[in-house]
């Protein structure tokens, strides 16, 4: 029995590692191919593949120091007792991994853009918004570790900061950009929204950051899907916003570098420090470049994860009987746990979700090309 368990664990470890290498090769190939096709390869500093590979390498190497450090600091993930029973074995795995891969993405992205003098103001704004949400996530992680429970800062406080950050960011864009009051749509169409842009900005920042946060529930899930989404967004904004293309490439690469330590079985989790910041970075680029339609497609999986939680809670409350117990739409939410509870191995769920985001990325890039 012990030998069988070891064999199963070894097989899962190999499957997670193989999935990581497949994703790394695929994203690298796409980045290189599009750089060659577009002619960007003639100017290596303004390609996608160069910052992507650089950030991947830096984060991968940094992880060999950061992960043991987090472990020595006893920054261990608190596992929910009412969560999937298979996750109990993850107890003791260090969390707050966002503290070593997010700074690489932010610093490298900003420095790369500054060195090439492209879209520096816009990238600086994206860095500030991402940093703000990352700090909120870090404080939440710290409170969870300090209390040894899953209760960090209050949900109202966290949501308030997210909404406030989105409002301030939107106000800056609205006051400095004359084109931002029209919501860009595919095929050159535009929807005049005027001051409603502020409400959209506020919602997008909060929704995107929380959606990525909800997706971070399996080894390699949030990191891998975010890497694909950032590369897709980089391809969408590349023709008009080379600086933000580089910013997205650095984030995609940093996610891949983190995934080297986060693939199944994970040696570290990103925590709210990483997931909230990733969502904030995606939202920032979508808002600045007025490509929210593309962001909506690229974030389709994150949206489904969020909707599954909303639907689960709503249905449970609506069907609550005299005994105070309601019915559930899913075996567990977010929806990735539903598949896990249905008997799917983690790696199968994660690989399926990777494929879904890849299809969405192709759709977003294809629609952008047609437009």
Swiss-Prot record:
Protein's UniProt name: Phospho-N-acetylmuramoyl-pentapeptide-transferase
Q: State where it is primarily located.
A: membrane
The Swiss-Prot or TrEMBL record lists the needed cofactor(s) as: Mg(2+)
Question: Which enzyme class, named as a word?
Answer: transferase
Give the EC number(s) under which this enzyme is classified.
2.7.8.13
Write down the membrane topology.
Multi-pass membrane protein
Query: Pfam families, alphabetically?
Result: Glycos_transf_4, MraY_sig1
Q: Which residues form the signal peptide?
A: none
A GO MF term: metal ion binding
Task: Name a single GO cellular component.
Answer: plasma membrane
In this entry, which stretches build a coiled coil?
none
The record's PANTHER family line, in alphabetical order, gives: PHOSPHO-N-ACETYLMURAMOYL-PENTAPEPTIDE-TRANSFERASE, PHOSPHO-N-ACETYLMURAMOYL-PENTAPEPTIDE-TRANSFERASE HOMOLOG
**Sequence intervals crossing the membrane:** 19-39, 48-68, 95-115, 119-139, 155-175, 180-200, 227-247, 284-304, 349-369
The record's section on CDD domains has: GT_MraY (cd06852)
Summarize the protein's role.
Catalyzes the initial step of the lipid cycle reactions in the biosynthesis of the cell wall peptidoglycan: transfers peptidoglycan precursor phospho-MurNAc-pentapeptide from UDP-MurNAc-pentapeptide onto the lipid carrier undecaprenyl phosphate, yielding undecaprenyl-pyrophosphoryl-MurNAc-pentapeptide, known as lipid I.
| PROSITE patterns found in the cross-reference section | MRAY_1 (PS01347), MRAY_2 (PS01348)
């Amino acid at each position: 029995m012990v030998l069988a368990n070891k064999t199963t664990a070894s097989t899962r470890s190999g499957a997670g590692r193989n999935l990581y290498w497949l994703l790394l090769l695929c994203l690298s190939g796409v980045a290189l191919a599009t750089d060659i096709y577009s002619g960007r390869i003639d100017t290596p500093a303004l390609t996608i593949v160069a910052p992507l590979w650089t950030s991947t390498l830096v984060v991968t190497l940094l992880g060999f120091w950061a992960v043991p450090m987090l472990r020595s600091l006893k920054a261990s993930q608190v596992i929910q007792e009412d969560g999937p029973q298979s996750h109990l074995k993850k107890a003791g795995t260090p969390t707050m991994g966002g503290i070593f891969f997010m700074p690489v993405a932010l610093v490298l992205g900003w420095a790369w853009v500054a060195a090439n003098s492209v879209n520096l103001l816009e990238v600086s704004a994206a860095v500030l918004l991402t940093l703000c949400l990352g700090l909120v996530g870090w404080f939440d992680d710290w409170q969870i570790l300090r209390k040894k429970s899953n209760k960090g800062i209050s949900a109202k406080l966290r949501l308030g900061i997210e909404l406030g950050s989105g409002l301030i960011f939107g106000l800056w864009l609205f006051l400095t950009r004359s084109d931002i009051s029209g919501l860009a749509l595919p095929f050159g169409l535009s929807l005049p929204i005027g001051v409603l842009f502020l409400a959209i900005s506020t919602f997008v920042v909060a929704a995107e950051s929380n959606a990525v946060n909800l997706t971070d529930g399996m080894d390699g899930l949030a990191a891998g899907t975010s890497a694909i989404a950032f590369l897709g967004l980089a391809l969408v904004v590349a023709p008009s916003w080379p600086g933000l293309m580089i910013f997205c490439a650095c984030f995609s690469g940093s996610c891949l570098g983190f995934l080297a330590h986060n693939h199944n079985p994970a040696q570290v989790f990103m925590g709210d420090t990483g997931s909230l910041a990733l969502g904030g970075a995606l939202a920032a680029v979508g808002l600045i470049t007025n490509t929210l339609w593309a962001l909506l497609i690229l974030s389709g999986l994150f949206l489904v994860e969020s909707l599954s939680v909303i639907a689960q809670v709503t249905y449970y409350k609506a069907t609550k009987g005299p005994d105070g117990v309601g019915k559930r739409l899913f075996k567990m939410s977010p929806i990735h746990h539903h598949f896990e509870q249905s008997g799917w191995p983690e790696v199968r769920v994660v690989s399926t979700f990777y494929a879904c985001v890849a299809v969405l990325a192709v759709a977003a890039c294809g629609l952008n090309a047609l437009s």
